[in-house]
Amino acid sequence: MPRQVLGLLKELGVSADHAENRGWGGLVNGSLVEAAISTGFVCLLSRDRLFSESASRALKRFPDFSVVLIVIPQVRGAEFVTRFRAAWQTQDLRPVPGSLVSWPAGK
């Protein structure tokens, strides 16, 4: 996910960070979910479908955590942020504890 999304999320009042900023770039699947949970995160956003599906398997052990697959098409950072903002304005991003959800729905 483009790092520029962090600025938008913070602007929207969402506490967020990028895995790379935390030194988690090498973590995969359940290990990344565990690291996120251990530092107080309740949700992970990803554009990678295979990663999201794999990480969601860890949800059986962490039923209060959610994985959200962002299905906005791959474009450059600034354009992605524009599309993310537009989607946010028309559709709530609602993580569901213990689940993998796709957002925005219908994409």
Positions of the model-derived regions?
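Acidic, metal-binding active-site segment of PIN/NYN-like and related structure-specific nucleases
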Residues: 29, 36-58
